């Protein structure tokens, strides 16, 4: 059984859940990140116990690998089981959001209470687009394997999806992510390429648990995606693609509002 490295956060002592094993918040980070990225938001959601997971090739899971989305979903299920988590809300950002959607749609997700996705791509609708993305991701992976990591990261954060970042913010991210291992990042990037990901929208629309889509108001690509596919969208002010980093207070408030609202919904109202 493969289990991912993770960190547990207990609820605040004054929380009514402190003495009870209620639903957990399980957090999945993006490419180049770690579970620690979620710490500010998780602490602000301190009425709930949290599990901050390091995905394969990242953080304390750097020595672990994954053979695609189904394998990562299995690792996630095994990690939850090993930590005694029976009921949980699953939240994911970017790559973590894509993994979260896949797990909710196709994985062993007994006990899943709901889904929170930040800037996660639903996939590509045709083979031509998937093949082009595979080629693009292979080129990035080759750079992560062969070139100095700060040099690759500097170019990585010049991509259009990070257009809201100013030079100082880009420099901070390059420094923050420079402790990654290029070979491990390359392997994970290829294993989870959008070219390998199934088109998730139809399965997402059939979910029988509530879900929401969170997006920074400056993240034009994913705002358009959410609007195009009529996802249940909540926007975060003064934030781009990484909204939980830019505005953790507003992000946590949206999470708590969604959990509160969803916990009161009758089964017939779920997901909408």
From Swiss-Prot:
Alphabetized InterPro entries for the sequence: AB_hydrolase_1 (IPR000073), AB_hydrolase_fold (IPR029058), SHCHC_synthase_MenH (IPR022485)
Return the EC number: 4.2.99.20
Coiled-coil segments on the chain, per record: none
> Reaction catalysed?
5-enolpyruvoyl-6-hydroxy-2-succinyl-cyclohex-3-ene-1-carboxylate = (1R,6R)-6-hydroxy-2-succinyl-cyclohexa-2,4-diene-1-carboxylate + pyruvate
Name the source's superkingdom: Bacteria
Q: Cite the annotated pathway.
A: Quinol/quinone metabolism; 1,4-dihydroxy-2-naphthoate biosynthesis; 1,4-dihydroxy-2-naphthoate from chorismate: step 3/7; Quinol/quinone metabolism; menaquinone biosynthesis
Q: Which cysteines are joined by disulfide bonds?
A: none
Quote one Gene Ontology molecular function term. Answer: 2-succinyl-6-hydroxy-2,4-cyclohexadiene-1-carboxylate synthase activity
Q: Name one GO biological process term.
A: menaquinone biosynthetic process
Q: Keyword set for this entry?
A: Lyase, Menaquinone biosynthesis
Role according to the record = Catalyzes a proton abstraction reaction that results in 2,5-elimination of pyruvate from 2-succinyl-5-enolpyruvyl-6-hydroxy-3-cyclohexene-1-carboxylate (SEPHCHC) and the formation of 2-succinyl-6-hydroxy-2,4-cyclohexadiene-1-carboxylate (SHCHC).
Q: How does it assemble?
A: Monomer.
UniProt lists the family membership as follows: Belongs to the AB hydrolase superfamily. MenH family.
Per its record, how is this protein called by name? Answer: 2-succinyl-6-hydroxy-2,4-cyclohexadiene-1-carboxylate synthase
Query: Gene encoding it?
Result: menH
């Amino acid at each position: 059984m493969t289990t991912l490295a993770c960190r547990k956060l207990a609820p605040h002592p004054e929380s009514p859940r402190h003495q009870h094993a209620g639903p957990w918040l399980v957090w999945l980070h993006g490419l180049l990140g770690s579970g620690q990225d979620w710490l500010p938001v998780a602490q602000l959601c301190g009425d709930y116990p949290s599990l901050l997971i390091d995905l394969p090739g990242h953080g304390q899971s750097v020595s672990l690998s994954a053979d695609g989305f189904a394998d990562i979903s299995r690792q996630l299920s095994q990690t939850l089981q090993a930590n005694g988590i029976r009921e949980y809300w699953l939240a994911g950002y970017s790559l973590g959001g894509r993994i979260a959607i896949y797990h909710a749609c196709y994985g062993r997700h007994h006990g899943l209470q709901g889904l929170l996705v930040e800037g996660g791509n639903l996939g590509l609708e045709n083979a031509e687009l998937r093949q082009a993305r595979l080629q693009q991701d292979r080129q990035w992976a080759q750079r992560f394997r062969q070139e100095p990591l700060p040099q690759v990261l500097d170019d990585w954060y010049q991509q259009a999806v990070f257009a809201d970042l100013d030079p100082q913010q880009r420099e901070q991210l390059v420094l923050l992510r420079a402790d990654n291992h290029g070979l491990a990042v390359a392997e994970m990037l290829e294993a989870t390429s959008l070219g390998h990901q199934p088109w998730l929208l139809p399965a997402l629309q059939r979910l029988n648990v509530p879900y929401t889509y969170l997006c920074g108001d400056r993240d034009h690509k994913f705002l358009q995606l959410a609007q195009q596919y009529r996802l249940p969208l909540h926007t975060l002010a003064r934030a781009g693609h990484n909204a939980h980093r830019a505005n953790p207070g507003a992000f946590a408030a949206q999470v708590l509002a969604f959990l509160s609202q969803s916990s009161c919904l009758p089964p017939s109202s779920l997901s909408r």
